[in-house]
């Protein structure tokens, strides 16, 4: 599913004022790159990225105003092409008449922002990159546990939703159940959220669908969370050798990002919520430089070398 972003979306989500070119507010923005047409103001348009959103700051505007009226009209007409999604003018600067005329003629929206140029670029870039980020969906449950985004996966019926319910009761926050939408917003960052249709909902076999926010309050849910850890729940297999020390760390690749993964076997009597809670705390401990498994291994090796073990 490819996101469609239009100039109208910028008006809806940011403190922008439409100055002219209203006919083009439904133009599609196809890239997260933003162009500052500095060299174009001199008349050099050979490599003009006309498909990008254009941003005019104080420097570009000062140069533009130093041009003659005829030159300003020429630059404005060449800036406003049939595929340019819009021109944003920062710092609340007045829009020259030549630019307004070219905007109305070509249908390129001119948007005015009261913010500084750097702030405008930063916010627009972050917004567009999140919209155009690579996207996938995974069957599982995403929970925020002590600030760690834990993605719980496993075959259907293994107890993912029931475990998430117990985690919510223990004070943690549900992000998504059953279907987790994941976007790669950076080279090493995965952000998960719930589809709007099932946001805040949990499906519990025997009970049906429950609204977590209604039952437990607004503090029991959040709209999105960065995924840091994967917990794979699987039915206990007597023939399989499970990790008992934690020295070897499995990884799971989601799009271009590798995430640490722990496999937790399921059988009666095991408190999965507590185990996953501890896994999240242990993950935080590792990020702070404390690895209990490695410390135990080093302690054991030292005792063996000293001959303290018989």
Curated annotation (Swiss-Prot):
Give the EC number(s) under which this enzyme is classified: 2.7.11.-, 2.7.4.-
Protein keywords: ATP-binding, Carbohydrate metabolism, Kinase, Magnesium, Metal-binding, Multifunctional enzyme, Nucleotide-binding, Serine/threonine-protein kinase, Transferase
Which cofactors are named for this entry?
Answer: Mg(2+)
Which residues are in coiled coils? none
Question: Which reaction is recorded as catalysed by this protein?
Answer: [HPr protein]-L-serine + ATP = [HPr protein]-O-phospho-L-serine + ADP + H(+); [HPr protein]-O-phospho-L-serine + phosphate + H(+) = [HPr protein]-L-serine + diphosphate
Residues where ATP binds: 154-161
Give the region (Important for the catalytic mechanism of both phosphorylation and dephosphorylation) as residue ranges. 202-211
Q: Where is the active site?
A: 139, 160, 178 (proton acceptor), 244
Q: Which Gene3D superfamilies match?
A: HprK N-terminal domain-like, P-loop containing nucleotide triphosphate hydrolases
User: What's one GO MF term for it?
Assistant: ATP binding
Query: Where on this chain does Mg(2+) bind?
Result: 161, 203
Transmembrane segment boundaries = none
Q: Name one Pfam family in it.
A: Hpr_kinase_C
Give any extra note attached to this record.
Answer: Both phosphorylation and phosphorolysis are carried out by the same active site and suggest a common mechanism for both reactions.
Q: How does it assemble?
A: Homohexamer.
Q: What is known of its domains?
A: The Walker A ATP-binding motif also binds Pi and PPi.
Known function: Catalyzes the ATP- as well as the pyrophosphate-dependent phosphorylation of a specific serine residue in HPr, a phosphocarrier protein of the phosphoenolpyruvate-dependent sugar phosphotransferase system (PTS). HprK/P also catalyzes the pyrophosphate-producing, inorganic phosphate-dependent dephosphorylation (phosphorolysis) of seryl-phosphorylated HPr (P-Ser-HPr).
What is stated as this protein's family in its record?
Answer: Belongs to the HPrK/P family.
This chain's protein is named HPr kinase/phosphorylase 1
Q: What is the lineage of its organism?
A: Bacteria, Bacillati, Bacillota, Bacilli, Bacillales
Query: Source gene?
Result: hprK1
């Amino acid at each position: 599913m490819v996101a469609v972003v239009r100039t109208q979306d910028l008006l809806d989500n940011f403190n922008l004022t439409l100055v002219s070119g209203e006919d083009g507010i439904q133009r599609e923005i196809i890239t997260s790159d933003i162009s500052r047409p500095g060299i174009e103001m001199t008349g050099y348009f050979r490599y003009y990225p006309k498909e990008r959103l254009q941003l005019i700051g104080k420097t570009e505007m000062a140069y533009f105003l130093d041009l003659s009226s005829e030159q300003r009209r020429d630059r404005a007409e060449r800036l406003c092409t049939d595929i340019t999604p819009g021109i944003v003018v920062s710092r609340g600067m007045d829009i020259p008449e030549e630019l307004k005329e070219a905007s109305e003629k070509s249908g390129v929206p001119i948007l005015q922002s009261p913010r500084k140029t750097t702030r405008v670029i930063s916010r627009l870039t972050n917004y567009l990159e999140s919209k155009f980020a690579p996207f996938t969906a995974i069957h599982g449950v995403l929970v925020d546990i002590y600030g760690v985004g834990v993605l719980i996966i496993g075959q259907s019926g293994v107890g993912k939703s029931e475990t998430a319910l117990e985690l919510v009761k223990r004070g943690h926050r549900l992000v998504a159940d059953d279907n987790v939408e994941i976007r790669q917003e950076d080279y090493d960052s995965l952000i998960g959220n719930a589809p709007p249709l099932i946001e805040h909902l949990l499906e519990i076999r025997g009970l049906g669908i429950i609204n977590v926010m209604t039952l437990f309050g607004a503090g029991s849910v959040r709209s999105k969370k960065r995924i840091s850890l994967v917990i794979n729940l699987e039915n206990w297999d007597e023939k399989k050798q499970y990790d008992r020390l934690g020295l070897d760390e499995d990884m799971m690749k989601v799009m271009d990002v590798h995430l640490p993964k722990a496999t937790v076997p399921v059988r009666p009597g095991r408190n999965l919520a507590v185990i996953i809670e501890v896994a999240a705390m242990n993950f935080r401990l590792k990020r702070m430089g404390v690895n209990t498994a490695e410390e135990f291994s080093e302690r054991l090796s030292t005792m063996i070398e000293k001959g303290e073990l018989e």
